[in-house]
Amino acid sequence: MTIEERTVGSMVVLDVSGRITLGDGEGLLKEAVSNLLKQGRANLLLNMAEVAYVDSSGLGALVGSSLAARRQGGAVKLLNPSRRLHDLLSMSRLLQVIEVCASEAQALESFEPNRRVAM
């Protein structure tokens, strides 16, 4: 798994690719989020467009990251989850914990509600 980091306004976008599974990504994701939270950067958008698979450990890493960000007044939101991941989040009622955004602009607007975002 690889993670590329970029900043857009007040949020950090993590472009994630590969698999988020036990021993193959979930630890890397937790570490990346933890490091950002230690820097006070708690508004995170995970771009999941290139994520091939997420197992239960990966799902746990997503939920744990979301809860950690909330404790710091931020949030972890998802962009472009696979249909399978979206269905899994829906069936497990985790969409109440992790918001899925339709676009980077929508995510940025949700983090910065008073900012007008060009579409």
Question: What are the functions of these language-model segments?
Answer:
Residues 4-6, 79, 101:
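General small-molecule cofactor/ligand-binding pocket signal
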Residues 20-98:
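Amphipathic alpha-helical interaction surfaces in cytosolic regulatory modules
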Residues 8-10, 83, 105:
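Residues that form or immediately flank small-molecule/cofactor binding pockets and catalytic motifs
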Residues 1-15:
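Short beta-strand/loop segment at the start of cytosolic alpha/beta domains
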Residues 100-119:
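A charged, well-structured terminal subsegment
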Residues 16-18, 103:
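Active-site donor-binding loop signature of nucleotide-sugar glycosyltransferases
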